[in-house]
């Protein structure tokens, strides 16, 4: 034997006789509050009535008429209640928990939406406030979001993205640490010598290219400088002197050669080279003369 509740859910044109036992229990909520023996079945039947079927007005009119009839004949309500208990004991209906009722309530409320949702709207959420049904279960357990378009990433992609993020973070941190170290190192300020200090240092350098520790200490005290500053100045001055001396020596040597060529005087090294060349030339000339004499003597012998 099929339960009238499932017939209500299946057939949109349910008759008033099939809804009579449940409508009486639902109307008991409006008449008196002490006859609430089946809250779950009353909520399911009321949810099916709210679903918006064609005989909706007729159902509400019949319920209103039966409500007045129930107030006048209270003993008839007790008789119907006993009959309903007997039917339930014969059918052996299982005890329905609150989550299925919440699911039925959500399914019955679904047709109330006025037309299809727009394309740009958010995905529908199949959730209803089950606190109105009197259930003690949390609403989050009966909620099912309808966002089915998103695709879950595979673990390999997640690991790749996390590894790339870690590498970028580590490189950024290393670059930041390097820049902070470079910026944190104080740059040594260049010592600004006065004209008087430079004059004294140049005079000392003209006499002594290298200083002793005692002389360096004396110059530092006289010029109000540190020994390190005096030492560094003499080191730089010696390097500059070597560069200038190398360039001056090359230029001076070329100038001397030009002057000596103009005057006709030669340097000792050049004289030694020229002497060897002249000796070689004289030897060659003597050899040529000897060969010529031998040729002449041979010619006279033939004559």
Swiss-Prot record:
Residues 157-170, 182-191, 289-303 have a biased composition (Basic and acidic residues). Coiled coil: none annotated. Interacts with RNF10. Interacts with TCF15. Residues 186-245 bind DNA. It comes from the Eukaryota. This is Homeobox protein MOX-2. The gene is Meox2. Residues 86-100 have a biased composition (Polar residues). Its main location: nucleus. One of its GO terms (molecular function) is RNA polymerase II cis-regulatory region sequence-specific DNA binding. Transmembrane segments: none annotated. The polyhistidine repeat may act as a targeting signal to nuclear speckles. Keywords: Activator, Developmental protein, DNA-binding, Homeobox, Nucleus, Transcription, Transcription regulation. Residues 63-81 have a biased composition (Basic residues). GO terms for cellular component: cytoplasm; nuclear speck; nucleus. Disruption phenotype: Mice display defective differentiation and morphogenesis of the limb muscles, characterized by an overall reduction in muscle mass and elimination of specific muscles. Embryos also display a cleft palate phenotype at 15.5 dpc. Mice lacking Meox1 and Meox2 show extremely disrupted somite morphogenesis, patterning and differentiation. They lack an axial skeleton and skeletal muscles are severely deficient. It is found in: Nucleus; Nucleus speckle. Residues 111-136 have a biased composition (Low complexity). Residues 63-191, 278-303 are annotated as: Disordered. The keyword Transcription applies. One of its GO terms (biological process) is limb development. Mesodermal transcription factor that plays a key role in somitogenesis and somitogenesis and limb muscle differentiation. Required during limb development for normal appendicular muscle formation and for the normal regulation of myogenic genes. May have a regulatory role when quiescent vascular smooth muscle cells reenter the cell cycle. Also acts as a negative regulator of angiogenesis. Activates expression of CDKN1A and CDKN2A in endothelial cells, acting as a regulator of vascular cell proliferation. SUPFAM superfamilies: Homeodomain-like. SMART domains: HOX.
């Amino acid at each position: 034997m099929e339960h009238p509740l499932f017939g209500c859910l299946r057939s949109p044109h349910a008759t008033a006789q099939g809804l009579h036992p449940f409508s009486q229990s639902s109307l008991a909520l409006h008449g008196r509050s002490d006859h609430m023996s089946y809250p779950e079945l009353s909520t399911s039947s009321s949810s099916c009535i709210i679903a918006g079927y064609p005989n909706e007005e007729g159902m509400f009119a019949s319920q209103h008429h039966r409500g007045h009839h129930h107030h006048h004949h209270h003993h008839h309500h007790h008789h119907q209640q006993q009959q309903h208990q007997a039917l339930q004991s014969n059918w052996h209906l299982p005890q329905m928990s609150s989550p299925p009722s919440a699911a039925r309530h959500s399914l019955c409320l679904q047709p109330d939406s006025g037309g299809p949702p727009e394309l740009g709207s958010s995905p529908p959420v199949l959730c209803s406030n089950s606190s109105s049904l009197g259930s003690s279960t949390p609403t989050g357990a009966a909620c099912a979001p309808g966002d089915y378009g998103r695709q879950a990433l595979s673990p390999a992609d997640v690991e790749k993205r996390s590894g790339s993020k870690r590498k970028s973070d580590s490189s950024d941190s290393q670059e930041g640490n390097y820049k902070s170290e470079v910026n944190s190192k104080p740059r040594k300020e260049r010592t600004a010598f006065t004209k008087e200090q430079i004059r004294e240092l140049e005079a000392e350098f003209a006499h002594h290219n290298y200083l002793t520790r005692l002389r360096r200490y004396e110059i530092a005290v006289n010029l109000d400088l540190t020994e390190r500053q005096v030492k560094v100045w003499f080191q730089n001055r010696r390097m500059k002197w070597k560069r200038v001396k190398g360039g001056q020596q090359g230029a001076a040597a070329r100038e001397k050669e030009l002057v000596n060529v103009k005057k006709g005087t030669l340097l000792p090294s050049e004289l030694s080279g020229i002497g060897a060349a002249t000796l070689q030339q004289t030897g060659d000339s003597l050899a040529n003369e000897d060969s010529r004499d031998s040729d002449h003597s041979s010619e006279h012998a033939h004559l």
